[in-house]
């Protein structure tokens, strides 16, 4: 039995939101390397940082899409483009999100609403729109980006933690309803990963020392650690896995 042959997505169509940098970029590249054509959900369609070009250089197709998840009209327009160009969608990686830092007493209603609209509402309605393709196809793979912050409390990030906990449970709800359509819905929950979003925080030696003291493996993750898990969950190798959240936290949450 050739197990490695099952970790591929050859010929599939995948949408990755928040694809321009960090984890989204790594996921898009991993899926393309494994054989998928990629629709790139971007907050600014003109700023993909060369990602579409890189994917096309692999011999895969790339479709940049304007997709600010706080704007429902952009979500609808993006799916119209997916229908026009591909008329099908096999894989969705709900990566786009925001992580504002603010103590609870300083959180404004606008802060609260915006974080929920991108992280939770956006994930819900992107998945719902994907379902229109996947239910008809009787096939789909949805992978949501939660966080270890959905399992532990991080001071100064109450709203973010709440949304990531919500994504973990939203994952179960979608999985429960859509399993009968051969759609699996899972999530990954990373710890601190070296990305543009964590670069400034981890550049502070005290911050880095604190993070490393919490991680059992005593190392900070790389984007490929998350991308490899996403690829696995999107592949035939994970066809019997649904409704689960895979912690990629180096052991932080076991202590």
What function would you assign to each model-found segment?
Residues 1-8, 152, 230-231, 242-255:
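Short C-terminal tail/terminal secondary-structure segment
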Residues 13, 20-21:
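Conserved glycine-rich cofactor-binding loop
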Residues 36-50:
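Conserved glycine-rich Rossmann-like NAD(P)H-binding loop of the short-chain dehydrogenase/reductase
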Residues 75, 103-104, 108-116, 211:
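Substrate-binding pocket helix/loop in short-chain dehydrogenase/reductase
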Residues 127, 163, 171:
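Active-site helix of classical SDR
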Residues 132, 176-180, 239:
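Alpha-helical segment proximal to the catalytic Tyr-Lys
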